[in-house]
Amino acid sequence: MLVLAVLALAGLLAATASASARPVTAADRALLARPATAEEHVAERVAERLTGHEQIAVRCGNTGVPDPHVLGATPMQNGHAFDYFLMRPAECTYLTWFHDAPKRWDPRTCVASDCGYVFEIAWALQTVAHESYHLVGYTNEAQVDCYGMQSIWFVASRLGASVAEAQALAALFAQRIYPLRRTETPAYWSPECRDGGAYDLRPAGHAWPS
């Protein structure tokens, strides 16, 4: 099931997390004006821990980016973010599924009917991490995507996964999804995204990507 899912995913890699260099819009203000949903609170708590920022807002809705395949967006102006990011509603749903039953989505043990969603779960975890690094101030998509991949384990563990499962999800992304970036979405790929590379967040260790 996992191999088939990977092959199907190869044609969908235009679905990427993205930073949008634009100011706050009226649509953003409308989303931010309403209370966060339970799903959005889940993403907010993880993003706050990952960035060290307080009162980050995450909203699920229109990302404000024309490409319908974009999973998330962090509005920025003059290189500065606004301490909020947007995700597609589907990503919030996947995060909630994972938070409610982490073991169900373990790529090593999932049943066939659930394994078909494990890649979507991994994308949702990576989207939170990816956009969080934009909030910190990083704008290079290849660098941000690499950092996000290396933080999948953190997001997964904060949502209740065991260390082993969190690392397995990160490895799944690194081994099965990230290599396809090179040809499908090259702006999000870098040869320095590797153990010991320039974008290695933990060069002293070798448990790549975790």
Predicted ranges, named:
Residues 21, 29, 47, 54, ...:
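Metalloprotease/metallohydrolase-associated module, dominated by Zn2+-dependent proteases
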Residues 122, 126-141, 145-149:
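Active-site recognition of the HExxH zinc-binding catalytic motif
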